[in-house]
Amino acid sequence: MSDWRLNGQERYPSNAILYKATFPDFWQTAYARKNRFYQKIARYARRHVEATGKGGEFLEGEKIRHFWHEHCEFCWEKATTDTACTFYCTEDLHYWICAECFGDFARRFHWQVRPVEELCGQTNIS
């Protein structure tokens, strides 16, 4: 039986390590520690403000969280920093998978889960 959510994701690496992130807690930790997730958002926000000359007020304090959202790689459910949701992400914070799709496809892709604290504790991001 085919699944409408599968559209070329076969290219995703099998046995990938994913980190379970529960929002808004994940954001609150990132903001407090200024970890790599926070740094990624801050870098994107600064680039946006520099390019457009607008939105500088969002670089102050926790407002910066409004610059980020992602979608599940499979069903396109939206993740935001201030909405209660659980997503799984790759170490580079590039791919995000909602809890439902993770549950449905974890065996197929042989994903492994590590504690998000391992990811949150890292301060550098490429």
Please identify what each model-predicted range represents:
Residues 1-2, 118-126:
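Short intrinsically disordered terminal tails
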Residues 6-62, 81-84:
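Short Cys/His-rich Zn2+-coordinating modules
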Residues 61, 95-120:
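Short metal-binding segments enriched for Cys and/or His
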Residues 65-71, 91-94:
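Short metal-coordination and nucleic-acid-contact micro-motifs, chiefly zinc-binding Cys/His arrays
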Residues 72-76, 98-101:
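Short cysteine-rich clusters marking metal-coordination/redox-active sites
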Residues 79-80, 106:
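Short functional micro-motifs and their immediate structural scaffolds
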Residues 80-92:
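Canonical RING-type zinc finger of E3 ubiquitin-protein ligases
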